[in-house]
Amino acid sequence: MNIRNARPEDLMNMQHCNLLCLPENYQMKYYFYHGLSWPQLSYIAEDENGKIVGYVLAKMEEDPDDVPHGHITSLAVKRSHRRLGLAQKLMDQASRAMIENFNAKYVSLHVRKSNRAALHLYSNTLNFQISEVEPKYYADGEDAYAMKRDLTQMADELRRHLELKEKGRHVVLGSIENKMEGKGNSLPSSGEACREEKGLVAEDSGGDSKDLSEVSETTESTDVKDSSEASDSAS
């Protein structure tokens, strides 16, 4: 399975996945609105044949009276690929992109009160908190929970990871300079320098600097149907 940033050519297949999985559906222009306005924030999950089996459609909220924050418009995973942790990985990727590109402080979403699988995922696995109940939010009259996830901890982890990478880069440069002084050789080739850097960064970072993407790969939601029913009706 591969998770990557959504591209314009993916939007029609994302819409098809949405129609298969969710009661909340959107016109194609709404997908293009997200893709063109916030191209960094939406992600797709694809199988070994490159077929889209899940997606997250996300955006930034434009509220000048609030801190920067993102919003999950829609999340879906096809039934054939649920219980693989894909929903969690898609959500984490989108949240990470919100931090890196827009300095988001939190992310919000809406979920049907009756969607127990999605509530379990959001509350127990992704640390969303219910902020309020919005009566008759959905077109069929069902209420929605408005939920928020604080992104401070994820932002701190990203910052530490970048600091470790920068520290490793300085260690590599120092090692190269020492070798040059000791041997009197010319500068190493770019390939040699890259190999030096990879080895030293791995030694320096140890277990504590594990890439966040690796963390999400090993962490799967438990007893969750991967929440492909979770979505926002997107006002």
Curated annotation (Swiss-Prot):
Disordered as annotated region, ranges: 175-235
Subcellular location: Cytoplasm; Nucleus
Claim: Acyltransferase is one of the keywords in the record: yes
Chain intervals with Basic and acidic residues compositional bias: 193-213
GO biological process, one term: negative regulation of maintenance of mitotic sister chromatid cohesion, centromeric
GO terms for MF: protein N-terminal-serine acetyltransferase activity; protein-N-terminal amino-acid acetyltransferase activity; protein-N-terminal-alanine acetyltransferase activity; protein-N-terminal-glutamate acetyltransferase activity
Name of the featured protein: N-alpha-acetyltransferase 10
Organism the protein comes from: Bos taurus (Bovine)
